[in-house]
Amino acid sequence: MFPNLNHRMLSVVDLFAGVGGLSEGFARARTDGKPIYELRLLVDKDPEAALTYRTNRPGIPYLVEDISNVAQKDILSKARVRKGDLDILIGGPPCQGFSVLRRNRALDDPRNEMMRVFLRFVRGLRPRLFMIENVPNLLVAAEGKFWREIRDFVSENYIVKAAILNACDYGVPQWRKRTFIVGFRKDLGVDDFSFPFVEETRKISPKQLTPHLGDEELLPIIRPWISTEEAIGDLPSLRPGGEASFYTQEPFTDYQAARRKDSRILANHIARRHDEKFLQKLSKIEEGGSNQELDGRRRFDRGREIKYLSQAYGRLHRKGIAQTITAHFLNPGSGRFTHYRDLRSITVREGARFQSFDDDFVFYGKMQSQQRLVGNAVPPLMARALAEYFGSMMLGQ
């Protein structure tokens, strides 16, 4: 099916790379203990994302440029491949027009033009496989019209499938549903393929993890869920405005140990400041609770015409699972981002833990920029699971 591919590492180009969550997953992917992929090039117009990635991974080329202004021949040149020889093209083109709050705006939203830009690179570069990560609503936007447009745009040369996957099924301690679109080039002889996912996503409560399926019922790639405490419980306790640069206890879960690796210094563990009046009100929310569970006099949206979302000012539960980490998780009012133990919002490092970044991956820039980079990233462990699954297919294993 894929002649000669099992004798070399597979080449990868990442467009709309951001801080490199997808690329991190592909870089971590292994088969028989050996790396599967070689990252040839990352491209994004965000200089802050580039600074963070280049500092962490200085040996991998990162082009800071608006991809819509980059010629396809330049991508091939910088990635050191010829047209048709690139193994995998990956990316998460921004499509904010498909977010839950904007589900009625799809094809007419100019922010969704970047999806078409990515697909033009698929046509022009002709990779053996392409993978797109995006928001779940992409598949239903405009009554499915945009998804059909994506499929039809490349269907002449690719077998294309899509699935909505949940990060918590792949070792990521976070409830995060995302759409993945994968296409195999038809001349490779792939008649059909599937995604590694459970038919019905396991159910949870915001407060308490429900029992996951027994391991014998799971595909090998599917992992038991990881609770909030299992993910971040080893990180030092902080007061608002406080910070910690060193670990104060040993990891007590495999997940914590894996994220630490050999790290000795703790980066990005700085708590946002909150005023006393705000903290007094926040203290009334119990572990696992939210603003909606407060009585009328105590609610944060008291007297407001527009009521807050159900997860606003939500507090994590140590035995529960983190909700979707967004680009605004330093703000307790934007979701369930208040620490279960400490009276504060979670830190950038805790957000990165929920996203499955290793502790030695340091985020640079102002805190507001750091939270954006973390929240917009593809969880590396989720990317790794898919990279290993499809990589094994390409290598005939």
Model-predicted segments: where are they?
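Glycine-centered loop/turn positions within well-structured domains
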Residues: 96, 189, 213, 332, ...
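Core alpha/beta nucleotide-donor-binding catalytic domains of modification enzymes
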Residues: 2-126, 136-140, 144-148
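Class I S-adenosyl-L-methionine
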Residues: 78-83, 100-300
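C-terminal target-recognition/interaction regions appended to catalytic cores
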Residues: 237-397
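A short, structural micro-pattern
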Residues: 37, 173-175, 226, 319, ...
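Short alpha-helical segments and helix-capping/turn motifs at coil-helix boundaries
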Residues: 74-75, 163-168, 307-311
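Short Gly/aromatic-enriched secondary-structure transition segments
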Residues: 59, 196-198, 340-344
